[in-house]
């Protein structure tokens, strides 16, 4: 059963400017594992924007936006084939009673925008 669907679109240039103007931007919104992935991708603004959009999409699929939690509670990584995967903090497991669920995300981008979709399925 589908519990929620979320989508978000981000202007890559806006994220690029935020990174350039705020040295703490990446550390403030992304986990250590996400930052390790960004290093492998040479801190590509498209990649960072895609992850940002994915976090927003997941928050919308949860049905609350970012009420009571933050971007660091949602971690977007890649599996061995490059497919994006989501890890949630223990706080979110408890907050949304997500014991038996799957989260599916898709991330894409053009030269100017990054977009992400998230679907939460209850098993």
Curated annotation (Swiss-Prot):
- The main location is cytoplasm
Q: Cellular location of this protein?
A: Cytoplasm
Q: Which cofactor does it need?
A: Mg(2+)
Answer yes or no on keyword Lipid biosynthesis. yes
Report the InterPro entries cross-referenced here.
Answer: 4-PPantetheinyl_Trfase_dom, 4-PPantetheinyl_Trfase_dom_sf, ACPS, Ppantetheine-prot_Trfase_dom
Q: What class of enzyme is it?
A: transferase
- Entry's Gene Ontology cellular component terms: cytoplasm
Molecular function terms, GO-annotated = holo-[acyl-carrier-protein] synthase activity; magnesium ion binding
The enzyme's E.C. designation:
2.7.8.7
Does the entry feature the keyword Hydrolase, yes or no? no
Q: Which UniProt keywords apply?
A: Cytoplasm, Fatty acid biosynthesis, Fatty acid metabolism, Lipid biosynthesis, Lipid metabolism, Magnesium, Metal-binding, Transferase
Q: Identify the domain of life.
A: Bacteria
Q: Which reactions are catalysed by this chain?
A: apo-[ACP] + CoA = holo-[ACP] + adenosine 3',5'-bisphosphate + H(+)
GO terms under biological process: fatty acid biosynthetic process
- Name the residues that bind Mg(2+): 8, 56
Q: Which family does it belong to?
A: Belongs to the P-Pant transferase superfamily. AcpS family.
**Function summary:** Transfers the 4'-phosphopantetheine moiety from coenzyme A to a Ser of acyl-carrier-protein.
Q: Which NCBIfam families match?
A: acpS (TIGR00516), pantethn_trn (TIGR00556)
Official protein name in the record? Holo-[acyl-carrier-protein] synthase
Which taxonomic lineage is given here?
Answer: Bacteria, Bacillati, Bacillota, Clostridia, Eubacteriales
| Gene this protein is translated from | acpS
């Amino acid at each position: 059963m589908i519990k929620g669907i979320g989508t978000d679109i981000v202007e890559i240039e806006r994220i690029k400017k935020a990174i350039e103007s705020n040295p703490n931007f990446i550390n403030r919104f992304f986990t250590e594992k996400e930052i390790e992935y960004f290093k492998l991708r040479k801190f590509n603004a498209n990649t960072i924007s895609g992850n940002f959009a994915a976090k927003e999409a997941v928050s919308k699929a949860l049905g609350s936006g970012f009420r009571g939690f933050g971007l660091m509670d949602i971690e977007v990584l890649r599996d061995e084939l490059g497919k994006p995967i989501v890890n949630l903090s223990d706080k979110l497991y408890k907050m949304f009673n997500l014991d038996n669920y799957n989260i599916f995300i898709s991330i894409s981008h053009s030269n100017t925008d990054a977009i992400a979709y998230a679907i939460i399925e209850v098993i």
